[in-house]
Structure formats: C-alpha cells, structure tokens
Amino acid sequence: MKSIIKSLAIAAFAALAFSSCSQEQNPVSKDNGIHFTIRTSENPQVKSFIDNNLNGTYTPKWSKDDKLAIFIGTIDENTKPTATLTNISETGLTAYFDGQVTGIGKDGTFKSFAPAKAFATGYSNGNVGITLAETQKPSSLTIDQACDILVAKEASYMADATTGEVTIDDLYFKRMFSIVKVALKGPESLNEEIVSKFSLTAPERTILTGRAAINLSSATIDKWNISNNTVTATYTTDAPGFGGKYPDLDNVVWFVVNPGTIEPGAKVVFAGETANYTFTKEVTLSKALTFPESQLAV
C-alpha cells in the first residue's frame, strides 16, 4: 500500500468463501453434543489483523481466542448462534476453532462468521443482523478487529460414528466490509500531537456504519436496518500522531466501513482531537472515492 489519494487510501484484502467436509455417518446423541474442530485456510488474506512488516506489506493474522459464531438449522427473528467456537491457536496465519455443539443432528450444514460478538439479531427471512460499529477502537498499526466481519460460505459436516468428532479443514472466509487508511497531515503546529479521536463524515445518504442484514449463505449484504454516515476512531493507547518519524506507520488512522462509492463533487469531513487541539477539514472530491469490498485498492 503506497499511494494516498486525497489523504485517504483504501485497502481490503480478497478472500474466497468456499468450504466443505465429509466424515463417517454417525448416530451421535444430541445431548452429548458434537465436538467441532475447524481449521481455517492458510491463505494469509483470510483475516485482517494488520501487522506492518516495515516493507510496505501487511500480514493478516488470526489471534488466540477469536470467536466464530456458527448457525445450524433455520434462522429466524428468535435465532441466536447455535454455538460459538474459540480459536485455540496462538496468533498466526491459521486458526483452529474448537468447541462442543449440542442439540444438533449427526450431520448437516452450518453457516458461520467471525467475530461472533458482532451478532445482533436474526431475521424472519433467514438473514442475520451484524453490527459494524460507528465508534471503533483501532491502534496505530491496525484496524479494530471487532469490526472486520468475515463470512464463510455454508459448509457441510458429518460426525465420526465413534467419537462424535467433526474435523473441518481449510475453511475460507470473505471479508464483508472495506478498510480505510487515512494518513494524518497538517501544519507544523500539530507536529508531535497524538490523536485521541478522529472521524470521517460522508454525505447524508452514504452508509458507512450501522447494522447490516447479511445473507450468510451467499455472503452478501441484503440491506442496512440501521445506518450512519459517520465513523469515528478513538484511542487511549497506541495512537497515531502528526509528524511522526515513520510516515505511513505512526501517522495513520484505520477505519472499517461499508463498501460503496462517494461521487465526485461530494464533500467529506475529517475531524479530530489531540490533547491541545481540535481540528476539522472539509474536502470536495475531485473524483469518485470508492470503498471496495474484499479487494486491495491503493
């Protein structure tokens, strides 16, 4: 990622959304439950925990204790995740989601997404409501992971007849939203000022954050039931600042937003706070500003 357009560059990493598994037939007791172990693909584009490698590249990683929400059966307005599995691996390119699932049959299909805590509600048409927070908590080097929604395409499972174990390899995910990188630039008076809050406001009808109704089977956004045209980053530690020693490293604000396009001529507003200053800048776009879904843009 190396160019900045109107002080704003967008990055989103592609990830495929296909997975399947097959095991032996199994008359497993629903009370005893089925033990799931799901290994994610080793594709480094699966997860957007962005570690900067100091060479212009970024290595996406899963973190230990990441949570995967899985859904088995019909989804309606009363639905909650059938189970939540936990990554038992240390931080790395591959996650192993592990957990016991009760009340399900010996075989079937499941839908899933991470992180599980983004789940808000189910809908009668089979979609799930997933929250993309208006106020986010990134660090100086990475997005707020809680906002990076990754959906896996529906996968099949079949438990081992003796052990009740399900092992699934190479579960691939699709990123639902777009990552925005804003490089902080300002007058000399702001040099060495550390940002505590920074926001991006788009035109009124633009949707940046809110609650999306997502079809987990197709990994698509059906509609937004709650929508905001703003996104705000807040910091308590590990915050970016102005005039840092390492441009594009310690002077960067990261957001996660709804994919879309803001047309030429529209106005966007950047605003923020440091310990000593508040600042606002309105920018009129000379060309379209696009936040792409699941792809890399510079």
Region annotations inferred by a language model:
Residues 2-298:
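Sec-type signal peptide cleavage vicinity
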